[in-house]
Swiss-Prot record:
Organism: Halobacterium salinarum (strain ATCC 29341 / DSM 671 / R1)
Family: Belongs to the arginine deiminase family.
Compartment(s) of residence: Cytoplasm
Active site: C476
EC identifiers of the protein: 3.5.3.6
Function: Involved in the arginine deiminase pathway of fermentative arginine utilization.
UniProt pathway annotation: Amino-acid degradation; L-arginine degradation via ADI pathway; carbamoyl phosphate from L-arginine: step 1/2
Taxonomic lineage of the native organism: Archaea, Methanobacteriati, Methanobacteriota, Stenosarchaea group, Halobacteria
Gene Ontology, cellular component aspect: cytoplasm
Transmembrane segments annotated in the record for this chain: none
Conditions for induction: No induction in fermentatively grown cells.
One example GO MF annotation: arginine deiminase activity
UniProt keyword terms in alphabetical order: Arginine metabolism, Cytoplasm, Hydrolase, Plasmid
This protein's name: Arginine deiminase
Amino acid sequence: MSSESPESVDDSTKVQATAEWDPLQAVRMHLPGAETFVGIMDPEPNLFLNDFSLVDAQQEHLSLSQDLEAALPASNPIHYLHDDLANGNGMNALLSSRVNFDLSELGEDEQVNRRDKMWARLHELSPHTQIQAVLGNAEVIRHHSHSDEEVPGSNPDRWDTTSVQLEQPLTNMYFQRDQQFVTQNGVVLCSMKEDTRKPEVDIARASWEALDGDEFDVDIVADMSQVREHDVTEHVPERDDIQETEVLVEGGDFYPAGEFSLLGVSAKIPEGEAYPKHDIAEDDTEYVHRTTYAAGHRLLMDDAFGSEEVGLVRAPFEAAQAHKDDDNGEVEMDIMHLDTWFNFVDDDLVVAHKELVENTTLDVYARTHGGEKPYTLERPDVNFGEYLREKGFEIVDVYDYVDPSHPDTDMALKAITNFLTVGPRKILPVRFSDDDDGVMKQFIDGIQEDYDVTVIPDGEGRKIINLRAGYGAIHCMTTPLRRTPE
């Protein structure tokens, strides 16, 4: 079966992505703000590697936006989350549901008057200021002054003080890949694994509803946040090794690839194996990283993908566990999503941790074309590397371009495949320094020289340090609005 991209629908406004190497025409991003500050103060519960500078992170993000603005051909290629919400009248409902004013210390008449003024002011603020309040789940608390002193002609509000409380803010919202993903058929809303990220899907839903209009035709083909359970064995009896798990899916696990699609799903655990540090018992048959097999199969039954084949790629937990040379308990973060160890460059070239690719499998589902179900399991437990070679892909091993003795090697391996492909053999990767001996330089130079790949900007990639504290890199920070053949 060819890996060439199918014809896109005859609708130049449809939100869709046909293949990861097809030209990117428009992309959505979110400039991190005050909501991210809480993650800087307390990194671990917010899924960050460590603390970082918010100001420097914002500068990095703006530079990244400028790179894409210059690289993409459309007149308005960069869509910011706050602008889409504001322009499509989606912001007001979020302000009402996620921002509150506590004026309980004021008198009853004062409360009504002040609340009306404060709400009116909130709705007049810039969209990015508003989205920070929304994502921060902000409560503004007015503390009444008990001073008896009165100054004729002064505003009595000047004597009060204010507190602002951010209640479990959505610190990871600048990783715009995970709350949703875009297929050939349309938009899939995800169901996040971590509690701290689950409400992000509500913001994503509002943003797509707001975007739907003259410029873009948005079709939400599945909302997995509304699905509580799915029994795989009811549809695929031969997959009786799939446990009853939550229906979880995150966008970093998905790639469109022309006539086929890939979705990373839970790891397959051999019978009798146990990993106590990861809460994997001997009777467990799968280990959930971020996306469950059940969610992948449910999306097949919902016909959400649109491609002729769909491969459910098992997370390479055992291979990653064996390869890890330190016991830091973070193996699941190293292979958190498919895009943390695999990516497409063109219709015949991928970059990957080759050892992981060669030591995991996928289940290949084929479209039935009028059958009782949209897809049926055609080939179970296919070696992932063999499948890619069948499709005509050469696998570039990241270890060919990373010096294992470099002090930043571990950091590089977490980000090296998380580049953004903006067109055939044209990528935007991350780098960590301007030095000639930087850990990413060998990869950036080598991929250009050995495989005729264009690296933007300026053949060097984008220097990102602070934004990387949240694990993800450039692929994680973007979601395509439209990616189709020229």
